[in-house]
Amino acid sequence: MALFAAAAFMTVPSFAQQTSPPPIAAPSPSGNQAAASGQPDQAEMMKQMTELAKLNENHKLLASMAGTWSYTVQMWMNPDPNAKPEVSKGTAIRKSMMNGRFFVTDVTGNMQMPGADGKMKDMTFKGMGIEGYDNVKKKFIGTWADNMGTSIMMSEGDYDPATKTFTYTGEYEAIPGMKQKIREVVKIVDKDHHTLEWYEDRGGQEAKTMEIAYTRKK
């Protein structure tokens, strides 16, 4: 192969063999040039990212809720406000991940749900949530997935220290074209108890459809 390549090179006219000078590489902009052109200074950007990656009091607040919890949930599936709720129980295990930046909760329980025939049936419920505090958005953030669907719900919220209450808002789409706005209120009663109330937007009116009471297992 080298021989054929050399022969081919010999047949090329001499002007084609002349090599042009290598292109001059454009100098990389200095920090001052980058700032002048509107580009962030890389060193400053890395410094800011390092600061934003640090844990703070908001992460410590989430850490205080780590542990194993038993829960009792009440669900109002009937739109009639006077209807009795469906009651079920389960366990939630909440653990730290990524050195306390996030907290993952594994939920297992039994609940009554309507089957395809409309009759109530016992089913095993499994769910997983991840919560954290986003230093960039300055918001508490959460995701939720369970064995009752294939989507992942995302939410953002704030914490009111005066009432020891988290308030999250989000949206999910259980059926195509039917997006549902939700509001989730988590109130810390004490270090061993907290509650969760779930509200859904039903035709422009908010209705509470679920309430969960958590007790820390010791």
What does each model-found stretch correspond to?
Residues 2-11:
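Bacterial N-terminal signal peptides
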Residues 12-16:
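Sec/Tat signal peptide C-region and signal peptidase I cleavage site
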Residues 18-218:
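Hydrophobic small-molecule pocket/channel-lining residues, especially in calycin-type beta-barrels
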